[in-house]
UniProtKB/Swiss-Prot annotation:
EC number: 6.2.1.14
Pathways involved: Metabolic intermediate metabolism; pimeloyl-CoA biosynthesis; pimeloyl-CoA from pimelate: step 1/1
Any Gene Ontology biological process: biotin biosynthetic process
The protein's assembly and partners: Homodimer.
Cofactor(s) named in the record: Mg(2+)
UniProt cross-references to HAMAP family, sorted A to Z: BioW (MF_00668)
Catalytic activity, reaction form: heptanedioate + ATP + CoA = 6-carboxyhexanoyl-CoA + AMP + diphosphate
Name assigned to this protein: 6-carboxyhexanoate--CoA ligase
InterPro entries, per the entry: BioW
Record GO terms (molecular function): 6-carboxyhexanoate-CoA ligase activity; ATP binding; magnesium ion binding
Function field: Catalyzes the transformation of pimelate into pimeloyl-CoA with concomitant hydrolysis of ATP to AMP.
Sequence similarity: Belongs to the BioW family.
Length: 230
């Protein structure tokens, strides 16, 4: 198995990213797909694109995918409150999402105080070394949803994670999500105005979390997210 990662940017501003874990015979088509995504993206033409291929030498940890909860009227305030995220923490998370900084990874906040707990600046924390497998083989989830569900499932695979809020920084995509192990994966429609680059990924955690261990899991442990529709 091989890890394939792509990152593209323009003048050091993030444009696009993608990654997966695949068999050797899928490398060529995966690289072509990531190349097309990186160079022909609505966020603009990159002046830098990097594709990294690395053989996986460690055992791959299986993670059960969160269930997708279909609810057109999902309310972010109610969802976060149900998961133990305070209004203060949510407001602080939205401040990060709406500011002008384009973060390339997630920001980790206290679910109680909203204080930022990681120290990675604009880079943030990157959930990497993962793949997604739909064991139903129905193909009813598009690539955007499978990528988001895979990341959300990895991020929430820890007992001290209360939930994750994600808003895409793509110009015309206005649907975000809130996900947690407790309540599943909820899409949030029209969470931002169209034609805006603001967005981000916020992880709300219990202050007792072993941050170094958690970050190592997200960034270094090979993971396969297995999805089964119930």
């Amino acid at each position: 198995m091989y890890s394939i990662k792509m990152r593209s940017s323009n003048q050091d501003v993030h444009i696009s990213g993608a990654e997966t874990i695949c068999e050797f015979d899928k490398i060529e088509q995966t690289v072509q797909r990531f190349y097309n995504k990186g160079f022909f993206h609505e966020n603009g033409q990159p002046d830098f694109l990097n594709i990294k291929i690395q053989k996986i030498m460690e055992p791959i940890q299986q993670i059960k995918a969160l269930q997708i909860i279909e609810d057109d009227k999902a309310n972010l305030q109610h969802l976060t409150q149900e998961c133990g995220v305070t209004e203060q923490a949510l407001n602080q998370g939205m401040t990060y999402i709406k500011n002008e900084t384009v973060y390339t990874g997630a920001i980790i906040l206290s679910a109680i105080s909203g204080k930022r707990l990681d120290s990675f600046g604009q880079r943030g924390i990157r959930a990497t070394h993962f793949s997604f497998e739909d064991i139903n083989n129905k193909g009813d989830l598009n690539e955007r949803v499978t990528d988001a569900l895979a990341i959300a499932s990895c991020i929430n695979a820890h007992p001290y994670v209360k939930g994750e809020l994600c808003v895409s920084d793509d110009l015309t995509y206005t649907t975000g999500y809130f996900a947690s192990a407790k309540i599943g994966y909820h899409r949030l429609f029209d969470i931002k105005p169209v034609n805006t680059r603001y967005g981000g990924r916020i992880i709300f955690v219990d202050d007792r979390i072993d941050l170094n261990h958690y970050i190592s899991f997200l960034e270094s442990t090979p993971k396969q997210v297995v999805y089964e529709r119930v």
